[in-house]
Structures are given as C-alpha cells and as structure tokens.
C-alpha cells in the first residue's frame, strides 16, 4: 500500500507539472499517431447516439471530446482524472460542449454507482494507475451489463524490426523530447518508465478477463507500439425470470 501511495503521489506531481505541455508532447512523442489510433478505435466502437459514456483518466479531454460528438446532444459523457491541472485544460477545451462533465477523482475508486454507463474508455492512462487490475475492476463495476469497455494504450511490439526500433526510440529519442518539454528529470523518466514497463497485449488481455470482461479482443497499431483492448460486461440474464 505504501508503494502504491508513493507511486500515486509521483504520478500526480508529474501530470500537475506537465499539463499545459501535455497535448504538444503527446503529439510529438507519438508523431501524432495517437489521433489516428483513436479514430480507428472509435470506428470499432460504433458508439450509439443518446448513450452514457465514461472516460477514465481523461486528462486534457481528447477522447472525451470524441465521445461527446459520438453520443450527440441527447447523450452524456463524463470524464474523470486525478490531476486538477489536466482537468483545467480539459475544461477549457470542452467549455462549449453541454453534454460533457469533467470531475476530479481516482480511477481505482470511481465515484459512480454500479451499472451507470454504456461505454467506459481509458486512453493512455492505465499505465499511470498504480494497480491496473483494481482500475479495470472498477471500470467493470460502473459499466452497465452488456456495456462496452475500451482501452487504448501503448504496448510492447512483437515484430523484431519494431522491437529494435522501439528500444532505440526509448533509449535515445524519448529522453530528448522529455528534457525539452518536462520541467524535471522525474517527469521525463516517468514517461519513459510507465510506457516501457506496461504489460504486453496478451498479458493485458488476461487482466481484462480477470476483471470480469468477456469477448475481449485486441487490435495492434503501428507494428504493436499501441494496442486496443475492447471487451464487454456480461449481460444480466436473470431479469424477467
């Protein structure tokens, strides 16, 4: 528990400090591929109008905005993040969107009732949570039976050529970007470590299943440097019996 608390405090400091530069840093580090990946994920999701979505670790609100457009004016999107400064940037970006609400909170203790949302998403945020499985179980809890969960996250490439490029990128290129945009060594080292140490797609799929999700499928992007995990909460077949 002590390690989790220290980890959580470190991550909070990092994102509090990097909030105003986060969008630009994300674009540069991913060569703007995160936008392409998110569009493909949204296409796979097929979000229905008038539904309720939760964006966990919403950060500055990029995926929240995409969900807002997808659910339409009759739908609702809630974004939650533990960094107040990241949320402030997100609130500026979503100020004109009446179907969006951003709240401060913890991914491991979501402040919502059971079975509240049709969709729950998390984009490039799970790697920053101290306990992945606890967060996934919380996402399952607040998801409606039959609802969809989607995670878009960095992953470990499996193709040999991409594995070599990935290793070189993290060893030589990532530190340069980090030093340019981060305020301290702690910040860019965390960006490196959290990404490089994140589980591969098959291990993460097992975590999704352990958290209670079914029919989990995985889609890799750009040689496996990122991956989508999409699953469902089992339907409640006891109703009406």
UniProtKB/Swiss-Prot annotation:
Keywords annotated in UniProt: Menaquinone biosynthesis, Methyltransferase, S-adenosyl-L-methionine, Transferase
Pathway the protein contributes to: Quinol/quinone metabolism; menaquinone biosynthesis; menaquinol from 1,4-dihydroxy-2-naphthoate: step 2/2
GO MF terms held by the record: demethylmenaquinone methyltransferase activity
Residues at which S-adenosyl-L-methionine binds: 60, 81, 106-107
Domain of life of the source: Bacteria
Top enzyme class: transferase
Catalytic function, reaction form: a 2-demethylmenaquinol + S-adenosyl-L-methionine = a menaquinol + S-adenosyl-L-homocysteine + H(+)
InterPro entries per the UniProt record, alphabetical: SAM-dependent_MTases_sf, UbiE/COQ5_MeTrFase, UbiE/COQ5_MeTrFase_CS
SUPFAM superfamilies: S-adenosyl-L-methionine-dependent methyltransferases (SSF53335)
GO BP, one annotated term: methylation
Annotated function: Methyltransferase required for the conversion of demethylmenaquinol (DMKH2) to menaquinol (MKH2).
HAMAP family assigned to the protein according to its UniProt record, in alphabetical order: MenG_UbiE_methyltr
Family stated for the protein in its record: Belongs to the class I-like SAM-binding methyltransferase superfamily. MenG/UbiE family.
Protein name according to UniProt: Demethylmenaquinone methyltransferase
Gene from which this protein is expressed: menG
């Amino acid at each position: 528990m002590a390690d989790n608390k220290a980890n959580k405090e470190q991550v909070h400091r990092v994102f509090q400090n990097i909030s105003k530069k986060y969008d630009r840093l994300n674009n540069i580090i991913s060569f703007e591929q995160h936008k392409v990946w998110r569009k493909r994920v949204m296409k796979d999701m097929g979000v229905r109008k008038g539904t309720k979505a939760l964006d966990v670790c919403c950060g500055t609100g990029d995926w929240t905005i995409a969900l807002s457009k997808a659910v339409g004016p009759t739908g609702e999107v809630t974004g939650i993040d533990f960094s107040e400064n990241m949320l402030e940037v997100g609130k500026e970006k979503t100020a004109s969107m009446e179907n969006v609400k951003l709240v401060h909170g913890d991914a491991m203790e979501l402040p919502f009732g059971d079975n509240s949302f049709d969709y729950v998403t998390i984009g490039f945020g799970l790697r920053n949570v101290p306990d992945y499985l606890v967060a996934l179980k919380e996402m399952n809890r607040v998801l409606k039976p039959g609802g969809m969960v989607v995670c878009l996250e960095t992953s470990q490439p499996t193709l040999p050529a991409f594995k070599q490029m990935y290793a070189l990128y993290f060893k030589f290129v990532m530190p340069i970007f980090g030093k340019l945009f981060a305020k301290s060594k702690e910040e860019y080292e965390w960006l490196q470590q959290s990404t490089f140490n994140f589980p591969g797609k098959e291990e993460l799929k097992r975590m999704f299943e352990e958290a209670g999700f079914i029919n989990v499928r995985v889609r890799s992007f750009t040689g496996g440097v990122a991956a989508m995990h999409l699953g469902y909460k089992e339907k409640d077949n006891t109703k009406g019996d």
